[in-house]
Amino acid sequence: MRKTKIVCTMGPSTDKPGILRQLMENGMNVARFNFSHGDYEEHKGRYDKVRALSKELDLPIACMLDTKGPEIRLGEFKNGVEKLTTGQKFTLTSRSVEGTNEICSVTYKELPHDVKPGGRIMLDDGLIELHIDEVGDTDIVCTVCNDGIIKTKKGVNVPGVHLSMPYMSQRDTSDILFGVEQGFDLISASFARNAQDIMDIRHILDEHNSKIRIIAKIENQEGIDNIDEILTVADGIMVARGDMGVEIDFAEIPAIQKHLIDRAMSAGKICITATQMLDSMIVNPRPTRAEITDVANAIYDGTGAVMLSGETAAGKYPVEALKAMATIAETTEADSSFDSLVHHSGTDNSRLNISAAVGHAACTTATDIGASAIITASKSGETARLLSRFRPDTQIIAYVLDETTRCQLNVYRGVTPLLMDYATSTDELISMSVAKAKSAGLVQDGDLVVVTAGVPVGISGTTNMIKVHMVGDSLLAGVGIGSHNAKGEVCVCRNAAEAAKKFKPGQILVVPFTTNDMLPFMREAAGIITEEAGTNSHSAIVGLTLDKAVIVGATNATRTLKDGMTISMDCVRGVVQAMAK
């Protein structure tokens, strides 16, 4: 099961009949709504479709509002587009003018007071570079450094300059309030520079009693420099490489990406890697080799999620792009070296609180015993977030009480969130959660699972219990020899002669006791169960020598177990359980 989550941006391509359904059915985890484009009516229409379809398919698709942020854009050009030539003069002004190939207005009126001669200004994601020659009260006179076509409303970046513009605009405030009203799960805060920027958004959410999670988009040098303070107040970060690649020397981006992902992992926070991951698939049905490697390397770096932007919003092949990204993620995670490359303590070498320590122990236990799943149930979903930070190889099945928490958890690496009714006791919680995981096809009879929760049940922030549990009902109990587990079909034999007639290699041999004439069958058995007790018995000694799963002292085993039954053997616990065929 893929653990890396995938974010898909909504747009005209996802509006086409059947596309949204295909995205959900093929692994989309988060729907991103880019508020730099479109109006409220357009966003609400798409939002309602996502919610309705995710309810129909019973999928916890999280909805993420991506703010416009404190960006600077060009004004209107008279002809909509102009050509700039290397060496020519071009003026940016805070005055309201009609744009030509000599002058254009900018949306940020204080820009002339923030820049100095000798600096650089980048237009349209860095496609055109301007050198600042002179700065006046309203005008910035520049020299064009390379030929290019410039269009109305294109972006303006000023590398290495602290802009005095306020973080929260009236537009962003209105957009966030719209998100609160609609019920969005996540907000990605564009151009986050420091902790205060995130707190400004948090203040608005708190005023409206909203539990929306905040993802800080790191897009400039200030955000990189202040990453640790941002992570203390944000729920996660997005490594937004688009504007970052304009603001910062492009050669530094790979190292910065690794650094940001590492800091997010250390803080135990969400990390999404974004921008141009499969950019060629906007027009082509297959990714380039470089793009495949880019996605894989982000996953090797430890990112919890990867994002598609124009590929799904406006591309010709949105479903193919999603499938390609999912395949790359699954293949990368299946690499034998993957676990060692992404292993991370998630603690940043600091002392853990009780809940985090229990979560860490649950992950370690699951790895040590080869558990099929870590199952957790919590009201707030915090336990699942704690488990995700430790990057276990085992899937995390998280039970929560409400749909909002379920959707918010769907952006966390390795977490499969499900709804469950309130449990009144620990025993009820374990039985309900294991039964639901089994009915969902996530575990099966005979699987070992690690269950972690809080005792007493129902109190948030009290994760303090771990239980190793085997799925299914116990048929027999005895003494396990060694630490192996086994699964297979039963063959009940009273003696070697009967075994010679009906035993097949790979079956579990069930006998009153063993003797030397049974050695050929014991060698080919998946496991051995005997009624005879004793760790020094023939079956125990031979089983250890052959490195087989053996349970001795299983009273009435030859009468309780029947030929053809499918069972599991847990030698650590000395338990035999029935399994569905």
Where are these regions (language model features)?
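Conserved, mostly hydrophobic/aromatic
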Residues: T9, N34, D66, G118, ...
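Glycine-rich phosphate-binding active-site loops on the catalytic face of alpha/beta enzymes
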Residues: M10-P12, N29-Y40, L186-F191, I237-I248, ...
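Short beta-alpha connecting loops at secondary-structure transitions
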Residues: M244-V246, M277-E291, A305-K316, V342-T347, ...
